[in-house]
Amino acid sequence: MIRFEDVSVTYDGAAEPTVRGVDFTVPEGELVLLVGPSGVGKSTVLGAVSGLVPHFTGGTLRGRVTVAGRDTRTHKPRELADVVGTVGQDPLSHFVTDTVEDELAYGMESLGIAPDVMRRRVEETLDLLGLAELRDRPISTLSGGQQQRVAIGSVLTPHPKVLVLDEPTSALDPAAAEEVLAVLQRLVHDLGTTVLMAEHRLERVVQYADRVALLPAPGAPLTLGTPPEVMAASPVYPPVVDLGRLAGWSPLPLTVRDARRRAGALRERLAATETPTPTATATATAAPAPSPSRPRRPRLLRKRAPVPSAALPVAAVEALAVRRGRVEALRRVDLTASPGEIIALMGRNGAGKSTLLGALVGLVPPAGGSVRVGGAVPHRTAPRDLVRRVGLVPQEPRDLLYADTVAAECVAADGDAGAEPGTCRALVSELLPGVADGTHPRDLSEGQRLALALAVVLTARPPLLLLDEPTRGLDYAAKGRLVTLLRALAADGHAIVLATHDVELAAELAHRVVILAAGEVVADGPTAEVVVASPSFAPQVTKILAPQHWLTVTQVREALA
């Protein structure tokens, strides 16, 4: 169904090909997972299937890509639309209508499908993806995860033979991700749909793949094999594989169920060790004191955040209520954040996580209750003053970046924060070594854009740092660097609140977890207590080694050392 024959792609102005000598075939009715570190060309490979590379992106494609017998060099994307359905990393770039139901129908209208067939398929897709209650909602009012489900639904309704998906579960909560992946598996098994999917969160998807295609490095040859074969040598792998490598299991397990069956001996060894007391999950009320063993922090991050008093919380939310039209987005929410504390907000899509962050940064006025950040009321505080109290890195970092170059972004950030010239650029040099001043932010990878947005926000050194889905689009290495950075910021006195669906990140990083449901706080406590008690939000290691309370492979490795 999909065939790559010695394909290389070189973008205009690039000295070397982004991908080189790619050669593989995806038969009809197979789900192939494309994996590899950030920047190795996964999105380029996906774009070559839909014809967006090179017809839309430009550059030179050498070799041959065929989809259902059609050569993508001679068939433009519109001539492949009846065969290939594509969902990219940014769902907002796909939408052309205003409401959910209209968006699901639009692709079929463009292909001239009969109205009665369109109606039936829309209803089927609404039910498949749990969108029935949202059918009349404006797309602009949906959460990021809800928008991602709509984008996936809009390419399912025309019933394409091939689905190309770039990070399809990155903005979805664990339950919604499982539902979407189950739908994809049903399409593959029952209808013979061919799926080529790139995804960084391998803990969610690797068990669904028939085969895995690995791009280990830029320009390196692609490796294709079964999931256990590829995971044994892959530079990127989920926690269940990491634990399997540590324990010496062969073949490597891909699911929690397989790992639990083999974990008896490992649990016995761990039972003889001390109960895990990870630094990330100890409740924090103040910035921890530095220790000799602490890794050296970046020079610019060793300045303490300007906290008025360590005895006072950086942020205090009491009985907060927020309304969006007739929808009550938040109801009687209480939350405090202390200096040096890292809090993970979790919950299903639409639970109110981003709304709570918006209230803390003054973007969303409360309908009831109170919000105070550093003693100020955010929505009544002038932006120039507020930026020194709280900073938000949004779900899409590009929303914060509006200049044409990295240098211009830094100049604007220095001016907005009232900081000395060069402050932001020095932060960028710490976080993004090697990025030139003249680079356009849109040419950066997802991880690089996140780092640039973080540098812009940190220029004002706000005591409270908010991040909305910070690991979206990041590979495991980039996520590890983010964890190190955020720990350093917390050690320097910053309070950090992050909204995330990444249960592995919460287990690795957060002191506290707050779970929201339908706008209300349903759980609030130390990470180990909250996630161990929740089947939906427990990390893989916790599920494998239950009833013992281990959260990460790092804890297990240290205990066995």
Curated annotation (Swiss-Prot):
<dbReference type="GO" id="GO:0005524">
    <property type="term" value="F:ATP binding"/>
</dbReference>
<keyword id="KW-1278">Translocase</keyword>
<dbReference type="InterPro" id="IPR050095">
    <property type="entry name" value="ECF_ABC_transporter_ATP-bd"/>
</dbReference>
<comment type="similarity">
    <text>Belongs to the ABC transporter superfamily.</text>
</comment>
<keyword id="KW-0067">ATP-binding</keyword>
<dbReference type="Pfam" id="PF00005">
    <property type="entry name" value="ABC_tran"/>
</dbReference>
<dbReference type="InterPro" id="IPR017871">
    <property type="entry name" value="ABC_transporter-like_CS"/>
</dbReference>
<dbReference type="GO" id="GO:0043190">
    <property type="term" value="C:ATP-binding cassette (ABC) transporter complex"/>
</dbReference>
<keyword id="KW-0472">Membrane</keyword>
<dbReference type="GO" id="GO:0016887">
    <property type="term" value="F:ATP hydrolysis activity"/>
</dbReference>
<dbReference type="InterPro" id="IPR003439">
    <property type="entry name" value="ABC_transporter-like_ATP-bd"/>
</dbReference>
<feature type="binding site">
    <location>
        <begin position="347"/>
        <end position="354"/>
    </location>
    <ligand>
        <name>ATP 2</name>
    </ligand>
</feature>
<feature type="domain" description="ABC transporter 2">
    <location>
        <begin position="315"/>
        <end position="543"/>
    </location>
</feature>
<feature type="compositionally biased region" description="Low complexity">
    <location>
        <begin position="272"/>
        <end position="288"/>
    </location>
</feature>
<keyword id="KW-0813">Transport</keyword>
<feature type="region of interest" description="Disordered">
    <location>
        <begin position="268"/>
        <end position="299"/>
    </location>
</feature>
<dbReference type="InterPro" id="IPR027417">
    <property type="entry name" value="P-loop_NTPase"/>
</dbReference>
<keyword id="KW-0677">Repeat</keyword>
<feature type="binding site">
    <location>
        <begin position="36"/>
        <end position="43"/>
    </location>
    <ligand>
        <name>ATP 1</name>
    </ligand>
</feature>
<dbReference type="InterPro" id="IPR015856">
    <property type="entry name" value="ABC_transpr_CbiO/EcfA_su"/>
</dbReference>
<keyword id="KW-1003">Cell membrane</keyword>
<protein>
    <recommendedName>
        <fullName>Putative ABC transporter ATP-binding protein SAV_5847</fullName>
        <ecNumber>7.-.-.-</ecNumber>
    </recommendedName>
</protein>
<keyword id="KW-0547">Nucleotide-binding</keyword>
<dbReference type="InterPro" id="IPR003593">
    <property type="entry name" value="AAA+_ATPase"/>
</dbReference>
<comment type="function">
    <text>Probably part of an ABC transporter complex. Responsible for energy coupling to the transport system.</text>
</comment>
<dbReference type="GO" id="GO:0042626">
    <property type="term" value="F:ATPase-coupled transmembrane transporter activity"/>
</dbReference>
<feature type="domain" description="ABC transporter 1">
    <location>
        <begin position="2"/>
        <end position="243"/>
    </location>
</feature>
